[in-house]
């Protein structure tokens, strides 16, 4: 398909991810802090809970991809899930930020149940959404444009959520922070629902895939045999691990290192503005140079900047604002490229084995993304607990301070170095090879269409 997508459809598609990021970024930045400092749950338990919830995702994510690939409706395969999953998703978001008056054990059980439900419903909405991008168009240029719009709006959605959350908490709850968090997420959940509805009504599934007749086991085997899908899966874990560890530590960093929790909103806003610029730069830069080269060079630059941040003196506020802006630009520059690379692996899989597994491929990607999110949350929780973090203390011990600085700077740097090395050495779907693959797939589709049109028709049918 070479149809040029309208700006309205690109915005509509981007609104779907803006809605997801309203919740996803909020959970990534605030949920650890909410559980430890508002709900009063031990940091070590929260870290373990985040990680164990991923065990369920190992089953739910591929199942959702399998179901989406086999869905047949007048709205397509993927769009119905976006609309009909939106309301329960919003309700569970509010429940996850609710603080019932329970014993410590009761609180831990409540948090585990609501957090697990939240991740399940995120799966129901987001796996079909991610797969939708693979069936709107198969034109490489249009895909980059679509994903650039997606991540500009996704960044705006995440910025809307994370920057407005604390003002909403203070406005709605005042001194009652627990009620403020509940009210704040309720407002944002309504906004997310409206965005998902807009996505549903403005997008169209153009690439028609024949009904799947294979089992989930066979589909899982096929995507695992796709070596380029495995490479992008590893890159996805590293990417989200870097942003999750830094994002989840940001509140602690502003409070205990920069010495002013009030600076958090401005600090986060600076990062998000950088994100917006990075998303907008993805399309022109990939028009100029191969997206794979842009990807690994940018990850290398992120590693260098992250290490440099480690040496910034405590309370050097202005310098840190400059660094976090650069990090925001560079990180969000590679994110849309990474999602296009995942779409390319679906084309590569179809080219190698004749099966287009869009839904389950993106289900696997979302699983590794959430695995990275869980590993990041677990790492923060375990390391803070190991360092003796005390939410009620006026000052933290030196071990905790060192851990917070390391999590905010060096841990992401390691992820970015590994991403650069892996992308440069092992990812092979560069522009010339991908053009060849798409050309051969298009020839095969035309040949199949011609064979269908030239099938002999019996006399009975003619009469």
Protein language model features and the residues they cover:
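Membrane-embedded alpha-helical bundles of multi-pass transporters/translocases
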Residues: 2-463
